[in-house]
Design a protein with these regions (language model features):
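Conserved, carboxylate-rich catalytic/transport cores that coordinate ions
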Residues: 189
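N- or domain-start disorder-to-order transition segments that initiate the globular core
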Residues: 3-32
């Protein structure tokens, strides 16, 4: 088999300030814009039982102003120069970014300096109460009141043992959010919002030396907090916690399978990603050919693989056609995976899956904003932005034996958590 693929490379240079902040610069002069991206090595996994949702709530609070930038001024300043900004929280990290014309980079850096070093003086009970309500409403709208909205948090709770840092959702639980105190928020901020727990990426129309100089100018005098590292000590392995059925306001049953697998950055993770594409991406993929098209058991079939730090999470999701029992669909999905284990896969299948995976990785780095986030994530969870190139170029080395092996080792039924979402009986539907 010939898999002569051009190596993928995302050029970058990294410097580390005396206070521990890593500054990564990716130069791309094709457009006069720059993405300024700050990522903190703290997400929902750094919370504790009883205070879930704290990382995400703090992200909301950190858009409410700072000591030298009053509430509302942050967005107004960026709008004046034609910039945009946003942030997000996930299991392993929290990130903030601005995309600005290249002449406005220093404004974005000053704003992020304010967020990192000058937030606590403005944090008060009123701000906390307002944002707590916003997040609780977000939970209701996005999860509790949306069809299938509670499936993934239930799946995480089944897959990982009680108290594991991945066992609760990033949005948190409402009772925990209601119990959150000002002290909780300030303690989390002090512990994790420090230069030695952050990565700054400048991507776009900026030179490497200029980027390093700006990073030092705006952040070098902010104090480190003593080499803080993410706190979870839990084993990354999941428990494969059985099956749970949820009734919801949905028209069709949906089956969610999840497996705890090796973490992002390992060769096995890349091999599992190829397996993911082979199973469900494209008309020629195994699940599309069998359960969707030939057997007509499912309306759709999808897979996913989270690039997470303590353990990867591999998922298979299928939506049943009208009248198809969930037991029959689940058995068909199991049979597809078992055939990979027993009979292996073809070189053509693996080559196609690799090419589709590379296509998606390339598309995911189309903008400087996307590239900044990818570099920041690699620098955060793998400790080196340069590891991104290494991972991207591992794909073409994946073999048929690799795919068969990781399916056998990591996708066993005994290692799996399953959530089945079915229509509520009062809706007049059955399985």
């Amino acid at each position: 088999m010939q898999k002569t693929l051009k190596p993928l490379r995302l050029p970058q240079e990294t410097a580390t300030l005396d206070n521990g902040l890593r500054v990564v610069v990716h130069e791309d002069r094709s457009s006069p814009i720059v993405a300024v991206h700050i990522m903190y090595h703290a997400g929902s996994k750094n919370e504790r039982v009883g205070r879930t949702g704290l990382a995400h709530l703090l992200e909301h609070l950190l858009f409410e102003g700072s000591e030298n930038c009053p509430k509302g001024q942050f967005d107004r300043l960026l709008e004046r120069v034609g910039g945009t900004n946003n942030g997000s929280t996930w299991l392993d990290r929290t990130n903030y970014y601005e995309v600005v014309p290249s002449h406005a980079v220093e404004l974005a850096l000053w704003l992020e300096r304010e967020r990192m070093g000058h937030f606590l003086p403005v944090l008060d009970e009123e701000m906390l109460d307002v944002q707590r309500s916003v997040v609780i409403n977000e939970r209701k709208q996005v999860y509790e009141n949306r069809p299938y909205g509670l499936a993934y948090e239930t799946l995480q709770r089944l897959l990982f043992p009680e108290g594991h840092p991945y066992s609760w959702p990033t949005i948190g639980y409402t009772p925990d959010l209601e119990a959150m105190s000002l002290q909780d928020a300030s303690d989390f901020y002090r512990r994790y919002y420090a230069p030695d727990n952050a990565v700054l990426v400048l991507a776009g129309d900026v030179g490497v030396e200029q980027g390093f100089e700006w990073g030092a100018r705006y952040f070098a005098d902010l104090p480190a907090n003593g080499g803080v590292r993410p706190s979870p000590a839990a084993n990354g392995a999941g428990t494969g916690g059985g099956t749970q059925v949820l009734e919801d306001r949905v028209s069709f049953p949906r089956i969610y399978h999840a497996y705890a697998v090796p973490p992002y950055g390992t060769e096995a993770w890349v091999q599992l990603d190829v397996l993911s594409y082979l199973l469900a991406d494209g008309e020629s993929s195994r699940l599309q050919q069998t359960v969707v098209r030939d057997a007509e058991l499912a309306q759709d079939a999808d897979t996913y693989l989270y690039p997470t730090e303590l353990a990867g999470i591999f998922g298979i999701v299928t939506t049943a056609r009208s009248g198809v029992p969930t037991e029959r669909l689940a058995a068909a999905v199991d049979q597809v995976v078992e055939r990979v284990v027993q009979d292996g896969v073809s070189e053509d299948e693996v080559t196609g899956a690799i090419r589709r995976a590379r296509r998606d990785h390339i598309n995911a780095m189309a903008s400087v904003e996307d590239r900044a986030e990818e570099l920041a994530y690699a620098a955060t969870v793998l400790s080196d932005a340069g590891r991104l190139d290494e991972i991207l170029n591992q794909y073409e080395r994946v073999t048929t034996d690799d795919v068969r092996r990781v399916a056998r080792e990591h996708l066993g039924i005994d290692r799996r958590a399953t959530v089945v979402v079915v229509p509520r009986r009062e809706d007049g539907h059955g399985q």
